[in-house]
Amino acid sequence: LEVIVSDVVIPPGAQVPRHYHPGEEFLYLVEGSAVHVEEGKPDLPLNAGDSYVIPPNAVHAPIGGPQGARAVVFRVHVKGRQERYLVPGPGAQ
């Protein structure tokens, strides 16, 4: 296993394409706000300072808030395997 750390920026009002990761994901919102949209769950507003755990294989497509969002994301990943899978449907780009 390996841990991948990403600095993720979502522009104001932009939606990340629907996708999932085979491993668990830990998100800490550094700046701005976002809405976490996850299949099968109610939309979750997030603000700077909030954290959230996304379970393995959870299809999600976050949306940047009015000022956008910046998050540090820690992803547990099996080394050598694909880390992100796009899912067609609403929010797909």
Place the predicted regions along the sequence by residue.
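A short beta-loop-beta micro-motif enriched in histidine and acidic residues
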Residues: 1, 13-26
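Glycine- and acidic-residue-biased ligand/ion/polar-headgroup-sensing regions
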Residues: 22-40
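Double-stranded beta-helix
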Residues: 1-4, 63-93
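Short beta-strand His + acidic residue motifs that chelate non-heme Fe in jelly-roll/DSBH
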Residues: 18, 36-37, 59-66
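Structural recognition of the beta-strand scaffold that forms the well-ordered cores
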Residues: 18, 26-28, 53-54, 70-75
